[in-house]
UniProtKB/Swiss-Prot annotation:
Stated name of the protein: NADPH--cytochrome P450 reductase
EC number: 1.6.2.4
Residues that hold NADP(+) according to the record: 295, 551, 613-614, 619-623, 655
Top-level lineage group: Eukaryota
Annotated Gene Ontology cellular component terms: cytosol; endoplasmic reticulum membrane; intracellular membrane-bounded organelle; mitochondrial outer membrane; plasma membrane
InterPro entries: CysJ-like_FAD-binding, FAD-bd_FR_type, Flavdoxin-like, Flavodoxin/NO_synth, Flavoprot_Pyr_Nucl_cyt_Rdtase, Flavoprotein-like_sf, FNR_nucleotide-bd, NADPH_Cyt_P450_Rdtase_alpha
GO BP, one annotated term: ergosterol biosynthetic process
GO molecular function: electron transfer activity; flavin adenine dinucleotide binding; FMN binding; NADP binding; NADPH-hemoprotein reductase activity; oxidoreductase activity
Induction: Expression is induced in the presence of benzoic acid. Expression regulation is particularly complex, involving regulatory promoter elements, differential promoter use and regulation at the post-transcriptional level.
Family the UniProt entry places it in: Belongs to the NADPH--cytochrome P450 reductase family.
Job of this protein: This enzyme is required for electron transfer from NADP to cytochrome P450 in microsomes. It can also provide electron transfer to heme oxygenase and cytochrome B5. Involved in ergosterol biosynthesis.
Amino acid sequence: MAQLDTLDLVVLAVLLVGSVAYFTKGTYWAVAKDPYASTGPAMNGAAKAGKTRNIIEKMEETGKNCVIFYGSQTGTAEDYASRLAKEGSQRFGLKTMVADLEEYDYENLDQFPEDKVAFFVLATYGEGEPTDNAVEFYQFFTGDDVAFESASADEKPLSKLKYVAFGLGNNTYEHYNAMVRQVDAAFQKLGPQRIGSAGEGDDGAGTMEEDFLAWKEPMWAALSESMDLEEREAVYEPVFCVTENESLSPEDETVYLGEPTQSHLQGTPKGPYSAHNPFIAPIAESRELFTVKDRNCLHMEISIAGSNLSYQTGDHIAVWPTNAGAEVDRFLQVFGLEGKRDSVINIKGIDVTAKVPIPTPTTYDAAVRYYMEVCAPVSRQFVATLAAFAPDEESKAEIVRLGSHKDYFHEKVTNQCFNMAQALQSITSKPFSAVPFSLLIEGITKLQPRYYSISSSSLVQKDKISITAVVESVRLPGASHMVKGVTTNYLLALKQKQNGDPSPDPHGLTYSITGPRNKYDGIHVPVHVRHSNFKLPSDPSRPIIMVGPGTGVAPFRGFIQERAALAAKGEKVGPTVLFFGCRKSDEDFLYKDEWKTYQDQLGDNLKIITAFSREGPQKVYVQHRLREHSELVSDLLKQKATFYVCGDAANMAREVNLVLGQIIAAQRGLPAEKGEEMVKHMRRRGRYQEDVWS
């Protein structure tokens, strides 16, 4: 074979790169998705092996004229998409299907038929980012080089597309509903026809559900006019067929009793572990951090040794919870299933495009305990659908009233913090035995993992992940009962068991802590890791300022742990300042003794500034301490410090953002608006980072 000269090699390299670009659509060098995320084989999903990624082809094959795409991180957007599909079918006769954005391609949307419509239900994740399953969709439409399959040179390639858009966001974040706003703006440049307004739901204001209900009615009216639809009386048409299988018992090895995947059911779980396939991790250590008896805060060490799971300092760990026994019993009792809890059921999608959210076959008990979000807040729209199945006329009238009057619903249900079963118990003691289980599967979202900021450094302990979590058990204003966190009380039960309690019952709750078929025995918990952009500067000599009251200190424990380890190796570590707040120094000062160890290792480079809100006549919070140390903060910012905030988004994070702008303006003799602009500039440059929740 003749030897290739340099030019030949260059030409071959160019051809190779071009071929890869063509066949992979550039995915090798696209902006990275979550490196820990996996699309995974979704149950009954549209994009299983052998299934098309061409949405137009899929709609033609299945006779659909309406597709509802969703971009969802926690399941809410997916739930809204399912509700829109169901309502469109039952009220207007649309042939609907629900579609996961990551399961389809978009290059052929320029050929989308004019007699069909596409919905886009898009949640915004974090700081204005797309959800994991919407990354490629977002990059495609917001990139500078959008290209479609059609050879037409038309400047408006999507002129045939009719679309509907609704966004899910949180106004406590700076980039409120950025996903739907940016996608809608990108669409408008391409020439499609939007039906109705681009709706926006606000979780930060607690009005997401009512925002959705208020938006969809005028949207349906506009869509009916555009597609010449006729509204009809909505009658329940099941999406799923649920049948009891008397030939199987719960002991049968093919029956799911809470296992998350088939490999877990078969006793051969294997990676890669992801949001679709958790690792059953041993809890290596657990202890209480508070010194008071009426409140709990947990420190847990989760072992990931041998799992091939990895994390980086600042990432999140997801815990897959189980519902408390009392809530499982309540739910089964309310719907007349208590005596049938161990009956085996098969669940099948009536429509070929329907995705079954629960592994099947399973039992009523397992479905409610492990797979359904039965403790979630109640949807007024879903409550209204139960009227037809009420046990008597009096109950039916009350349900109709609740479903029809949002203020009354707010008073009787929302303010009481009721879940579905509690809401129905407040109406009548009679069971709602006539409610089809298929309707409950359709109306109640799948039990979702809960995410926690990792409170350890991957440099210091790569095989163990630390969690710092306050246990929720509070009486909220207006509520007649204690509201108890689903996952934190589950973790508290595991901690109690590990520390010698044979019958743990945190706040009166019990859990199946040994898991399905005792597969979690020995104190195990299902987990996966989610990537975060909340990261230390790559140069450890750069100063950092951290603001983290309460459990908001979690990632900063990892940050400081890492900087102490780097210093011990002889690396130069820059000024490291933590503003920490809690109620009292002798009650809930998290890691109080540990900070002293890091102080010894980092010396003058570590400064911890505390704010105790209940120790003096005046409440003192971290934002007050920030203002008191304005000169220090300003000096470090001039040295290119990165500023971090972790904790409550609604109040603390918003006030810290405001105070920082005021500090910059005052210290530099600038107008207030200039200080605000400089904080925004820091955000854009990645020098102001938030890991916040509401």
